[in-house]
Amino acid sequence: QALARRVNSDLANGIGNLLSRTLTMIERNCSGSIPTVPTDYLDSEAARAKYPLLVHVKESLRTLEDCLDESYESLAFNNLLLHITSRVSDVDTFIDKHEPWKLAKDPDKRDELEIVLYTAAECLRILGLYVYPVMPSTAKNLAEQLGISLDFNSPLLRQKITWGSLPG
């Protein structure tokens, strides 16, 4: 039980730090509004080559669903929290690699900056849906901070996990 509390605390701190970091950059660079990016921004081979970590993060979040299903079925909540914590770390790595604070200084990199910030916010939205069953107040706070409305009681929750559903 002590391990579960520790993992839960680490996850809440990780999500909170990621949320704060993301929202601060959006506030500074996008007038506080989540940027809008084309839904097909990863469809070209060139885009996938330019953003390999984005592709990794997106795939990592997609596979999280299967990991969580196994954890819920076996009541292995520590594993569930560890899987989610790993994805939070992936998003942090993505941000660090793309250095949006540097992109913001170059007007020619505006599109790239918006893709990075949108991706971070979209990852947070999806992570919020995944943590809701074990950390409902964290998930609700995350949605509120992102300025989005989520119906956590919907039986169609998985349909909302589709990448690119974050309104910009």
Language-model-derived ranges and their functions:
Residues 1-112:
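Long, charged, mostly alpha-helical binding arms that flank functional sites
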Residues 66, 70, 75, 85-168:
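Basic, alpha-helical terminal appendages of large translation-related enzymes
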